[in-house]
Design a protein with these regions (language model features):
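GST-like domain detector, emphasizing the conserved glutathione-binding G-site
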Residues: 1-122, 126-128
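Short alpha-helical "patches" and their helix-cap loops
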Residues: 31, 81, 112-116, 149-165
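Catalytic cores of nucleotide-enabled group-transfer and carboxylate-activating enzymes in metabolic
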Residues: 81, 123-126, 139-146, 169
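Amphipathic alpha-helical surface "interface" segments used
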Residues: 84-90, 137, 183-186
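GST superfamily/GST-like fold recognition
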Residues: 131-151, 157, 162
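Long hydrophobic alpha-helical segments typical of transmembrane helices together
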Residues: 159-186
Length: 186
């Protein structure tokens, strides 16, 4: 029997979220690493929106959302509070993260204003560090934010976030999650 297929891109925080769940549960997949400027035809056929991650199950079911992949492989049902945290991360924080990290993609954007706006989420996170599945759903985005200007990030008074992120990034599961694969060519 063939394995479910996971289309992924190593540096995408949504794909990291899905891969962390897959690694933690030992869920077996055929990993297909894609380059987003050269998306495979099969991936586009099963998921025309062209974003990663995409999980194709053996019965033909396609799961296109990272959180749904997490829920599927971990049999995880988010609590109301967890849903609120993920919602803030995926909407409010991600909105500002993109404009901070990629200001040239948007009209009339001050990346420092967006860094400050994104920082409000991190300040809240510093007061209530997520654990378990919720942690895996959020930390890839905080990693991306931190890595954009690591000196600035490290200079902020977010002791709990710094410790939590360091712990996430040094975990064996994260190291496995970040294994480098060659581009999958069909």
């Amino acid at each position: 029997m063939s394995l479910p297929i996971l289309y992924s891109f190593r540096r995408c925080p949504y794909a990291m979220r899905a891969r962390m769940a897959i690694v933690r549960t030992g869920f077996q997949v055929e990993h297909r690493e894609v380059v987003l400027r050269d998306r495979p035809a099969h991936m586009m056929e099963i998921s025309p929106k062209g974003t990663v991650p995409v999980l194709l199950l053996n019965d033909g079911t396609v799961i296109e959302e990272s959180l749904e992949i997490m829920e599927y492989v971990q049999s995880w049902e988010l609590t109301t509070e967890e849903r609120e945290w993920v919602g803030r991360n995926d909407n409010e924080f991600k909105f500002h993260l993109d404009r901070y990290k990629y200001p040239n993609r948007y009209d009339d954007v001050d990346h420092i204003e967006h860094r400050e706006a994104a920082s409000k989420f991190i300040q809240d996170l510093d007061k209530e560090i997520p654990i378990g599945n919720l942690s895996d759903a959020i930390f890839p985005f905080i990693r991306q934010f931190a890595n954009h200007d690591r000196d600035w990030f490290d200079s902020q008074n977010w002791n709990n976030v710094h410790s939590w992120l360091d712990e996430c990034l040094s975990s064996e599961e994260f190291k496995i999650c970040m294994t480098k694969y060659e581009q999958w060519i069909q």
